[in-house]
Amino acid sequence: MDLELLQDLSKFNFPTPIKIRSKTSKTKKDEGDDDEDDLRCSTPTSQEHKIPAVVDSPPPPPRKPRPPPSAPSATAALMIRSCKRKLLVSTCEIIMNREEIDRFFSSVYNETSTTAKRRRSYPYCSRR
């Protein structure tokens, strides 16, 4: 561009720029205008437009009925009375004593240790 052309621009009389009001450039004196309120969209704030508050909450779900307590045996009743907490007494221990149980398991272990395991042989598979 020529410098002469830039200097000649000041000689031209341009009209004053038009000022357009925007919502962000609103001043306090402009807030009193009712004409702009009619053109603007706003959320209704009256009581009839509000969502009603929840007054009641739903009832809790019904509780499952508890089963009635079973009657304990005579030895279990003695043990329960002696402790504050309920003890779980196995019926196997009441019927059998420990020596019978030990004899049973020792006989099972003795039988398995004497027999040797046999390996399977597959004739169609060759060893490498």
From Swiss-Prot:
Changing residue 62 to S: In lgo-1; loss of giant cells in sepals. This is Cyclin-dependent protein kinase inhibitor SMR1. One of its GO terms (molecular function) is protein kinase inhibitor activity. Expressed in roots, leaves, stems, siliques and flowers. Expressed in the root elongation zone. Induction: Up-regulated by double-stranded DNA breaks-inducing treatments. Up-regulated by zeocin treatment. Residues 57-71 have a biased composition (Pro residues). Over-expression of SMR1 produces additional giant cells on sepals. PANTHER family: CYCLIN-DEPENDENT PROTEIN KINASE INHIBITOR SMR1, CYCLIN-DEPENDENT PROTEIN KINASE INHIBITOR SMR13. Probable cyclin-dependent protein kinase (CDK) inhibitor that functions as a repressor of mitosis in the endoreduplication cell cycle. Cooperates with SIM and SMR2 to promote endoreplication during leaf development. Specifically regulates endoreduplication in epidermal pavement cells to produce the cell size pattern. Is necessary for giant cell formation. Positive regulator of effector-triggered immunity (ETI). The keyword Cell cycle applies. Disruption phenotype: Increased number of smaller cells and loss of giant cells in sepals due to both a decrease in endoreduplication and an average decrease in the duration of the cell cycle. Its main location: nucleus. It comes from the Eukaryota. GO terms for biological process: defense response to bacterium; positive regulation of DNA endoreduplication; sepal giant cell development. It comes from Arabidopsis thaliana. The gene is SMR1. It is found in: Nucleus. Keywords: Cell cycle, Nucleus, Protein kinase inhibitor.
